[in-house]
Amino acid sequence: MILLTLLYLIIFYIIIDFIKKNYKTKNQLPSPLGIALPIIGHLHLLRTDPYKTLAKASKKTEHGILKCWNGEHLMVVVDNPSIIKQMYVNTNNFTDRPQTKVFEIISRNYKNSGFANGEKWKHLRGLYAPSFTKIKSRPHENIILKYVNFEIKSLKNHAITNSIYNPFLIENINSFGTKVITEIIFGREFSENEVYSLIGPMNKLFGILDTPFPSESISFLKPFYRRSYKECDKQCEELFKLVEKVYDDHLLNLDKDNPKDVMDVMIVETDFKEKDHVICICCDLLMGTKDTFNTIVLWFFVLMINYQDVQLKGYQEIIKVLECTGRDHVTIEDIDKLPYIDGIIKEISRIHPAGPLSVPRTAINDIMINGYFIPKGCHVFQNTYGAVYNYMKESDEPCKMKPERWIENEKLRKDGKLDPTNDLALISLPFSSGIRNCPGVGFAEYELFLLFSNIILNFHLSSPNNLKLNESGHFGLTMKPFPFLVDLKLR
């Protein structure tokens, strides 16, 4: 009798869930993925490269916005640049993050700026935003250049002894971004062992998160993923403890009137009362740099190898500028003189955005967008990949690397002739948009500029067999290229 009752309840739940997911209402969003199944929704269609599946589905809609079901969660996916702007820039209804088990673990119960919501997020944003402006930019540039020079020297030594280079190894360029951000945040140069001790738990954490968690979509599966959640928590706690030690060391030598680094600024801003928040924000910055920055660096190597003509044009532009300055390396002062190099950097993130589906947000309240009803609590995704490949003109060949397209885009803007529907700056948004976009995007762009331009200046990059590399990539926490080797040759 008990088993029969349980069976009836399960059948009843399945029927109700099916009706809930497929019931049509007025002003509802289109659902081009078709019928949503009970319990799993459209999860079976989103297992491989979901950003491509959703971009393809979006083409069937009128306005580039759709709904689907990620298990028990209603997803709203948008790739139309004008609607993205309407949602993320023109309203404050999409500044919250979903509260999931993984986000809770990573943020140590929502104590960081990445996953906190509401007034708490605004407060935490107020802690880290001033920290990047109160520390003068010149010391930042000097720190970046110091590590760029270290990296160039290391690459030269490698090219002399063995031209075949593996950019995925921790002892190679894989640790560059972490070295820079640690000195920016903590105010001192970390030893190799200290850097590796920070990278270790982050690599383990990202390795776990690269594998999908169906339990984030279907809550009753959580007990079956207890071990994975526990391992995530272990790695996050290890990173937290390492940063906590740095925090305690800072307290011993802190000058309230002259904060020397980002952590100092945040400690002073919190009046020494929010230790956990400061530590979690620092962990947030470390993790964001480690995975996203490294992914962009890997795609840089892939595209420079596959587009030898682009690499050559970039080199020629640098040489021409340096002949006028008399310097033997590129600095931030050269950024406006190297529009083609700037175009290379923008093309990398346009063609292969590190996060093709940006970090999700939630609707704080019910809202009408472009005539469609978006309910409170739904998960909202910006399909960065879909915005590029659905909204660039086919005649512009969006799949090809053309840095000069950014130069032309800027020229048209200055002349007042730019078509707003074909503005690359609005179509390509690899770091999201609105007040909840990536907080360190400006700093990251300078970092990428100095690193990439000086690599192109000093080395010719190719594949060991002179064949093109695979650009399909592997979708996990970020969109990374498959493993490859680089043939480094000194210029």
From Swiss-Prot:
<feature type="transmembrane region" description="Helical">
    <location>
        <begin position="1"/>
        <end position="21"/>
    </location>
</feature>
<comment type="pathway">
    <text>Sesquiterpene biosynthesis.</text>
</comment>
<keyword id="KW-1133">Transmembrane helix</keyword>
<dbReference type="InterPro" id="IPR001128">
    <property type="entry name" value="Cyt_P450"/>
</dbReference>
<keyword id="KW-0560">Oxidoreductase</keyword>
<dbReference type="InterPro" id="IPR050182">
    <property type="entry name" value="Cytochrome_P450_fam2"/>
</dbReference>
<feature type="binding site" description="axial binding residue">
    <location>
        <position position="438"/>
    </location>
    <ligand>
        <name>heme</name>
    </ligand>
</feature>
<dbReference type="GO" id="GO:0016705">
    <property type="term" value="F:oxidoreductase activity, acting on paired donors, with incorporation or reduction of molecular oxygen"/>
</dbReference>
<dbReference type="InterPro" id="IPR017972">
    <property type="entry name" value="Cyt_P450_CS"/>
</dbReference>
<keyword id="KW-0479">Metal-binding</keyword>
<keyword id="KW-0503">Monooxygenase</keyword>
<dbReference type="GO" id="GO:0020037">
    <property type="term" value="F:heme binding"/>
</dbReference>
<comment type="function">
    <text>Cytochrome P450 monooxygenase; part of the gene cluster that mediates the biosynthesis of the trisnorsesquiterpene discodiene which has a function during later stages of multicellular development, during the transition from fingers to Mexican hats. The terpene synthase tps8 converts its substrate farnesyl diphosphate (FDP) into the bicyclic sesquiterpene alcohol discoidol. The cytochrome P450 monooxygenase cyp521A1 then catalyzes the oxidative degradation of discoidol to form the trisnorsesquiterpene discodiene.</text>
</comment>
<dbReference type="GO" id="GO:0005506">
    <property type="term" value="F:iron ion binding"/>
</dbReference>
<keyword id="KW-0408">Iron</keyword>
<dbReference type="InterPro" id="IPR002401">
    <property type="entry name" value="Cyt_P450_E_grp-I"/>
</dbReference>
<dbReference type="GO" id="GO:0016020">
    <property type="term" value="C:membrane"/>
</dbReference>
<dbReference type="InterPro" id="IPR036396">
    <property type="entry name" value="Cyt_P450_sf"/>
</dbReference>
<keyword id="KW-0472">Membrane</keyword>
<protein>
    <recommendedName>
        <fullName>Cytochrome P450 monooxygenase 521A1</fullName>
        <ecNumber>1.14.-.-</ecNumber>
    </recommendedName>
</protein>
<keyword id="KW-0812">Transmembrane</keyword>
<comment type="similarity">
    <text>Belongs to the cytochrome P450 family.</text>
</comment>
<dbReference type="Pfam" id="PF00067">
    <property type="entry name" value="p450"/>
</dbReference>
<keyword id="KW-0349">Heme</keyword>
<dbReference type="GO" id="GO:0004497">
    <property type="term" value="F:monooxygenase activity"/>
</dbReference>
